[in-house]
Amino acid sequence: MRNSLLISLAAAALAEGKAYSPPAYPAPWASGAGEWAQAHDRAVEFVSQLTLAEKINLTTGVGWEGGQCVGNTGSIPRLGFRSLCMQDSPLGVRDTDYNTAFPAGVNVAATWDLDLAYRRGVAMAEEHRGKGVDVQLGPVAGPLGRAPEGGRNWEGFAPDPVLTGQMMASTIEGMQDTGVIACAKHYIGNEQEHFRQGSQENYTVADAISSNIDDVTLHELYLWPFADAVRAGVGSVMCSYNQLNNSYSCGNSYSLNHILKGELDFQGFVMTDWGAQHSGVGDALAGADMDMPGDVAFDSGTAFWGTNLTIAVLNGTVPEWRIDDMAVRIMSAFYKVGRDRTQVPINFASWTLDTYGNEYYYAGEGYKEINQHVDVRGDHAKVVREIGSASIVLLKNVDGALPLTGSERFVAVFGEDAGSNPDGVNGCSDRNCDNGTLAMGWGSGTANFPYLVTPEQAIQAEVLKNGGIFTAITDSGATNTTATTVAAQASACLVFANADSGEGYITVDGNVGDLVLHTVGPVLVEDWVNHPNITAVLWAGLPGEQSGNSLVDVLYGSVNPGGKTPFTWGKQRSDWGTDIIYEPNNGDGAPQQDFTEGIFIDYRHFDKYNITPTYEFGYGLSYSTFSFSNLQVTPLAASPYKPATGHSGPAPVLGKVLNATAYLFPNYIKRIEAFIYPWLNSTDLRTSSGDPNYGWSTSKYVPDGAQDGSPQPVNPAGGAPGGNPALYDPVAEIRVTVKNTGKVAGVEVPQLYVSLGGPSDAPKVLRGFGRLSLGAGEEAQWTATLTRRDVSNWDTVSQNWVVSNYTKTVYVGNSSRNLPLQQTLALKIGH
């Protein structure tokens, strides 16, 4: 009765469009759906051999600095199974050497090139694989980019679910085709850094920020790219630090059990972000499968899981089938990508670059060779350079100021952003400074530079090759008089600025010049971008180690710029309509971030309120020109959409749990300080737990249905990884002719937008894109396919996707504001 009432109340709240996460239990167990079947069967066979302690070792990290990687599970020596290695980052192998520093995700999005995204995924995975990494902690779809101030937006792709989703899928496919497990992160609503873990700086709050997101916005915006990741077969998903609707993401049963594992039929494992776990039993029942890094607080030696998870299974609080499912999900991902074939020993250490050191870094034990300095770079500099040049966006080019001809006699470069970091290329830990040119952001999503070709170095080399002379003023303290004198003498001036500094240099007078921006996202340029002395503006983003070479390729015309901005550039800060929280807004309780803008972020907001941007989403110039013509929209017959039906089988139980004596700490193992183990210290479970509340009735903290392993109904919106298979039925084919009307070969990015037509819908949303290379005068036909999902809305009442009766319109062009072709879409979808 109580359970039925709760379900009814939850359904009512969702139907009313409230930001609410109702409880959803039990955690769905993996079935081996779709392409997971063979890997799942192998995982079941493997897990069936394990003891309870060995299963716990798979699910629990050994603690911060308890192994050579940033995250390490326990091992299973009896079966020759070593610890699994989790390692950052989304743009290369973090905390090592002889690795490549790849362009950031935002640059990949600016290419609008799925092949480049795939190739970058392959190259990054080759390097992680070569270092012995099992799980690369990327790519990123959270943050999506709700507000331009989001500190980690650059790690992801774009504030658009389709562009991000397709980039996610291609990156994941590249990584996993190469034999490394990808990790889609940070799930979900992780849209700011302030208060993501609660208290910070001068503010004390009880809990992490809550992202309060209604059901429509969650499905149509923030969940969309994660669905693409699941459909692409991603092996792991990382739950985030923040709360979703006032429930911690790693313990939110609605987002993990109901949506991710139910609706999206995710077959892999959910990994916590480092320190994002807030309970033991609760998170296990809510759908978390692996705890990282394993300890409650770094180097504390205490754990929510480990011994405590062993106890919870022994006393029946966590059912046997749940721990079995956790282990099966982890091993399914392992086998799916072929780690049993591609795994090599871990040959680096995250905590030091010294050749010899302690394997157990915090404990200071296990002295051995920990860094073999394996060079994993191969020829990856080529793809770095290619992505760097392909992602450059030409924002302004007056009277053909670019490309440079190479005949300029005197080229001058201005700005700290053009030069080297005086403290060395890796002089700041995790790149946590802004000295010299900006080629990646900072934080855990970084990698060490093996070198960094600065713009100053690359431009000087080009100028000298052409017989010119060159000077660079990269000291931000240089006098304006000095800069003015040099500028007046130069044939061409190139001014460099980044997101943090450098705008003062654009006031240099006496010569026309070009401006290059290295930024993590949009910046306000309206005050100066139309200055007559600024003849060209390039956005180069965060291009990685080949920064200068990629830029020179475009500056001198060996590469015709084809990048399109993956975000909108507003004229003033208020244009975006969203912001992050800088100060607590809920007393000492969890800060509350209400996503009241709904689906209207970035260009959707600008369009809804008729705000004119400086540069719109999808905008980018070329050294050539292009035309669009002959739009053809062909509806395709599609069967009626049928909600998924039926039931799962019962939760499988693999092996047999013995009594507590079987799980006592082995006397042949030496304890390592602060290392997290699965074993008991006593056969008395209360004593072994050390928990003063041990023995409470499960009714006090175990939700209704959480322990139920009986057959469960299939989620009607589910049925296969990524959601109901009918969502991906093609419903229309779009064809358009694109012609290069200029005098040089170039690249154009056709973009397909759709208006869903409803009063609550955005004026238009991106639904497809391509990248065409065309010679001068050449034309080609570009084709795109719309799926049922592309023309559907999330219905909160039926809790499923529906195609509305509103008139739908197709638009094609080369930016969100330049769409010369449009046509009404007459669907042939059965009912």
What are these model-predicted stretches?
Residues M1-K18:
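Fungal secretory targeting signals
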Residues L14-D704, D708, N715, P721-N793, ...:
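Glycoside hydrolase catalytic-domain context in secreted enzymes
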Residues N818-H831:
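Short beta-strand elements
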Residues Q799, S804-Y806:
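A glycine-anchored, Pro-Gly-centered beta-turn/N-cap motif
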